[in-house]
Amino acid sequence: MKKFGLTILLSLCCFFFSNAQDYNTGIGLRGGFSNGVSIKHFITSKSAFEVIIASRWKGVKLTGLYEIHGRAFDTDRLKWYYGFGGHVGFWDGDSSSAYWGDPDTSSTVIGVDGILGLEYSFEEVPINMGIDWKPAFNFIGYTGLWADGGAFSVRYIF
């Protein structure tokens, strides 16, 4: 129990006293039409890989993205980004039966994704917040354009 308490105390100290400038890696939550976990890692000062694991309609989707970041509105803390990638997922088909047909149908989905967003990294705490739009096109399973991929993310950055 003492080790657990010490671990929590050290984590809080790192959280409150670190200076969150540019970051290498961010891990956090993503919420929107689908909710999940986001992990972003920079491979250069302006490019990053992001992995999103999200759930929707009793299923799960894994998305991998390559993103280009740039300074937004002449401030160091606010960045815009765009990118592309792909996804694979497994859905249970639990949606509107009027649109989908048989609501008991399960499906595997495979497709491509784009992303366009803004994110802000706080100076005082290692937290990053972002908003993005991530349209997708499924080639396999529920084929077609999915333009409802907007989300809000909060990440711990280090």
Model regions and ranges:
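Residues that define the transmembrane beta-barrel architecture of outer-membrane proteins
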Residues: 23, 33-35, 58-62, 78, ...
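Short loop/turn motifs that connect adjacent beta-strands in outer-membrane beta-barrel proteins
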Residues: 19-24, 46, 71-79, 122-127
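Transmembrane beta-strand segments that form the barrel wall of outer-membrane beta-barrel proteins
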Residues: 21-33, 41-57, 84-88, 131-139
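Flexible, solvent-exposed loop segments that connect beta-strands
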Residues: 47-51, 90-108
